[in-house]
């Protein structure tokens, strides 16, 4: 009892504890479904009378949509099992240095799925993708229900057998632990649920949605797609495929190494990413924008700049963490912590503690600008993402301050800026 009391006393809540967890759960649900009601063919933003009409006439549940989503998740699981891929070791998850194995074959799955989608469009025509347009809300509801069931399953599973628990999900409060995630690595055999959801069902579905919306625009415009839609699809597909090509890099991120798999990640991976991140493509499907050559080239340059920073920084960090003794990295300066970890203070990571976030945010602007300035709603992503990155930086900073102590203070003096060099 005494030991239990000490643990409870030392526990520090994130997101303002259970009340914050409930608030985020409700808010993200409202925003996700609200994005459909408020931004559609009736207007973006639509008038209240139109929103009310859509709300009344459009059912949330559709059996075909639920079956299709379950088939989608099952197909990707089967592809994970059946397609070739190397096995990579994750970072140590305990003091004994235990490292879990992860199958890296997400890129193969994406290529197969997108190949089937494109072949179907070529053979059957753009109209074969209209089910997604006509049942987008119902598909969102199916994904939402599935994400809640999945994170609840992982929460219950965490109480049975030998489980590595996430430190942040052991408060003892059911709501908070369910939200933040109690199990660090929920698995069925060697199938890691968290790592699988991180990069596959949501990310690949995001691209499928973009393609479906481009098909709808093609049908509406009588056989053409705007340059703005082409840009959005290229940027999103590029981001997704690049993430899957570099799938092993996710094994060193906070989502995998630190966070449990609760509602926050389950909902984020399966609902928020595909249904909210495809907002620009959905908007352009009913509000086409023709950019012209100059604007197209300017947005392309912005995307390339963001990607150069994002991928360069992440690649450098991943190589250094995987093999800090690599001769190619000997020019990099670092602080040796008392815990044995090395903190980079030069290269990309000498510019800002999260320079990769800056690159990510620049790309977010490139994804939103093709929508033009007819509505502020397509820019929701860049605003939300900026807030997310600032919050994630603060969260990471707090954890590192606790973890490294005075070494972190020394590191912050060496690398003064958080995200944007010379600004923030």
Curated annotation (Swiss-Prot):
Its subcellular locations are:
Endoplasmic reticulum membrane
Q: What GO biological process term is on the record, naming one? A: ergosterol biosynthetic process
Tell me what topology the record assigns in the membrane. Multi-pass membrane protein
Task: List the catalytic activities from the record.
Answer: 4,4-dimethyl-5alpha-cholesta-8,24-dien-3beta-ol + NADP(+) = 4,4-dimethyl-5alpha-cholesta-8,14,24-trien-3beta-ol + NADPH + H(+)
As given in the record, the signal peptide range reads none
The record ties this protein, via PROSITE patterns, to: STEROL_REDUCT_1 (PS01017), STEROL_REDUCT_2 (PS01018)
Its GO CC terms are: endoplasmic reticulum; endoplasmic reticulum membrane
Q: Which residues cross the membrane?
A: 19-39, 112-132, 370-390
Which GO terms fall under molecular function for this chain's record? Delta14-sterol reductase activity; NADP binding
Q: What is its EC number?
A: 1.3.1.70
> Which one Pfam family would you cite for this protein?
ERG4_ERG24
The pathway noted for it is: Steroid biosynthesis; zymosterol biosynthesis; zymosterol from lanosterol: step 2/6; Steroid metabolism; ergosterol biosynthesis
Primary subcellular site in the record, as a coarse category: endoplasmic reticulum
Q: Which residues take part in binding NADP(+)?
A: 317, 321, 344, 349, 356-357, 396, 400-404, 411
Q: Which domain of life is it from?
A: Eukaryota
Which keywords does this Swiss-Prot/TrEMBL entry list? Endoplasmic reticulum, Lipid biosynthesis, Lipid metabolism, Membrane, NADP, Oxidoreductase, Steroid biosynthesis, Steroid metabolism, Sterol biosynthesis, Sterol metabolism, Transmembrane, Transmembrane helix
Known function:
Delta(14)-sterol reductase; part of the third module of ergosterol biosynthesis pathway that includes by the late steps of the pathway. Erg24 reduces the C14=C15 double bond of 4,4-dimethyl-cholesta-8,14,24-trienol to produce 4,4-dimethyl-cholesta-8,24-dienol. The third module or late pathway involves the ergosterol synthesis itself through consecutive reactions that mainly occur in the endoplasmic reticulum (ER) membrane. Firstly, the squalene synthase erg9 catalyzes the condensation of 2 farnesyl pyrophosphate moieties to form squalene, which is the precursor of all steroids.
User: Any miscellaneous information on file?
Assistant: In Aspergillus, the biosynthesis pathway of the sterol precursors leading to the prevalent sterol ergosterol differs from yeast. The ringsystem of lanosterol in S.cerevisiae is firstly demethylised in three enzymatic steps leading to the intermediate zymosterol and secondly a methyl group is added to zymosterol by the sterol 24-C-methyltransferase to form fecosterol. In Aspergillus, lanosterol is firstly transmethylated by the sterol 24-C-methyltransferase leading to the intermediate eburicol and secondly demethylated in three steps to form fecosterol.
Q: Spell out the family assignment given in the record's similarity comment.
A: Belongs to the ERG4/ERG24 family.
Q: What is this protein called?
A: Delta(14)-sterol reductase erg24
């Amino acid at each position: 009892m005494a030991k239990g009391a000490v643990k409870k006393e030392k526990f520090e809540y994130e997101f303002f504890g259970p009340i914050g967890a409930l608030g985020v759960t409700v808010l993200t649900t409202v925003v996700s479904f609200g994005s459909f009601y408020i931004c559609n063919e009736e207007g973006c933003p639509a008038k209240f009378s139109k929103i009310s009409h859509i709300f009344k006439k459009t059912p949330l549940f559709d059996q075909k949509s639920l079956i299709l989503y379950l088939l989608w998740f099952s197909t990707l699981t089967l592809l994970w099992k059946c397609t070739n891929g190397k096995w990579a070791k994750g970072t140590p998850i305990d003091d004994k240095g235990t490292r879990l194995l992860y199958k890296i074959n997400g890129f193969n799955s994406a290529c197969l799925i997108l190949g089937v989608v494109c072949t179907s469009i070529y053979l059957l025509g753009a109209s074969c993708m209209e089910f997604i347009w006509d049942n987008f809300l119902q598909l969102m509801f199916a994904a939402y229900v599935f994400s809640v069931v999945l994170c609840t399953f992982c929460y219950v599973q965490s109480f049975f057998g030998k489980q590595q628990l996430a430190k942040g999900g052991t408060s003892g409060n059911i709501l908070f632990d369910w939200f933040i995630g109690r199990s660090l690595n929920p698995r069925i055999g060697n199938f890691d649920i968290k790592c699988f959801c991180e990069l596959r069902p949501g990310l690949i579905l995001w691209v499928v949605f973009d393609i479906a919306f481009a098909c709808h625009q093609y049908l509406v415009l009588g056989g053409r797609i705007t340059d703005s839609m082409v840009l959005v699809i290229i940027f999103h597909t590029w981001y997704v495929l690049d993430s899957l090509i570099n799938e092993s890099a996710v094994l060193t991120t906070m989502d995998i190494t630190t966070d449990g798999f609760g509602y926050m990640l389950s909902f984020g991976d399966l609902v928020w990413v595909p249904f909210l991140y495809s907002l620009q493509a959905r908007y352009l499907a009913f509000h086409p924008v023709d950019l012209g050559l100059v604007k197209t080239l300017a947005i392309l340059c912005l995307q390339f700049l963001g990607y150069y920073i994002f991928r360069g920084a992440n690649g450098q960090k991943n190589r250094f963490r995987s093999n800090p003794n690599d001769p190619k990295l000997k020019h990099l300066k670092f602080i040796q912590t008392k815990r044995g970890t090395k903190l980079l203070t030069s290269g990309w990571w000498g510019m800002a503690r999260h320079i990769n976030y800056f690159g990510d945010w620049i790309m977010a602007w490139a994804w939103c600008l093709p929508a033009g300035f007819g509505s502020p709603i397509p820019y929701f992503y860049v605003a939300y993402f900026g807030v997310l990155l600032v919050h994630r930086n603060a969260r990471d900073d707090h954890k590192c301050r606790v973890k490294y102590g005075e070494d972190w203070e020394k590191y912050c003096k060496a690398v003064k800026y958080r995200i944007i060099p010379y600004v923030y």
